[in-house]
Amino acid sequence: MQRPSNQLFDAYFTARTMRDVFSDQGRVQAMLDFEAALARAEASIGLIPTTAVAPIAAACQAGHYDFAALGEAIATAGNSAIPLVKALGKQIALQDPEAERYVHLGATSQDAMDSGLVLQLRDALQLIEADL
């Protein structure tokens, strides 16, 4: 898939650290951070077994995922969360098939995307504040 390039101006207008926050890797990791936090919160109130948290959290590393495949799936799914949550479930099932059923429990795709974006914005604000 051909993407527009910003190579001529990215370094001029944006710091590397800020580009990292809003990169594909940063976006996916932020949504995965939401999924791990959701599992921890749900386990803390007894909604899911505490034994499900470790396999879910372990699978919430962006490096586990094929970004090209995610990009293709996003094009047909209509949003980024649907294929990411499916891939997350498959990754969890490799370690603990029982834990897979608890991933994304009670959450919507919009929850994952919005919460991920807020985590990115938090990181961006910290960079801006540190630079003042």
Can you annotate each of these PLM segments?
Residues 1-132:
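A helix-coil-helix interface module used to build multimeric assemblies
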